[in-house]
Amino acid sequence: MKKILKISIGILLFIGLQSANAASLESTQKIFDEARGICKTFLKQCEPHLVISNQWQAVTHKEKDIYITSDLVKSLTEDELRAVIYHEVGHAVLRHTTREANWLMSVSANKTYTKEAHYNLRRAHEYEADRFASYTLKFTRRPNHLPEALFKIVPPEYWNVEFPTHPSIIDRVHRVKTIINKGGF
């Protein structure tokens, strides 16, 4: 298992997050602090963690721990990193892990489970987390950075692909831009 570290300026210096457009050391710490604050606003406690890895990944675990890999942090601008972290905060605040577990228990009790229904639920949660991030980013006056981050994270040949757990990037970006332009949550 990869070593998991709480983010700090010293750790960031150690792994060398000094690429040309990457978020600065101070801004990365600030974004992680903002994430904690947003969670507290919704009476949730969440903690961002940095995972030293050459993969590009951000995930929420048990609705309180947000993990983001060092290479993903290195690849994003400050505003794109904020958008990705706010998306993960959305999963925590909206209790997606608990909701999915409750759904799985109810369908297993009724013996009505299908993979497609489960995948639809997971994709719906992605849309909800995107909506949460977009709404939150509107208050920072930086709403367009979630689409930019999504396009950066996923290679162009996969933009139209719908994955079992995630909608296509094109569809997600279209929905986010609709939220940005029309407002609403």
Question: Model-derived features: where do they sit?
Answer:
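Classical Sec-dependent N-terminal signal peptides that target proteins to the secretory pathway
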Residues: 1-23
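A Zn2+-metalloprotease active-site environment signal
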Residues: 22-185
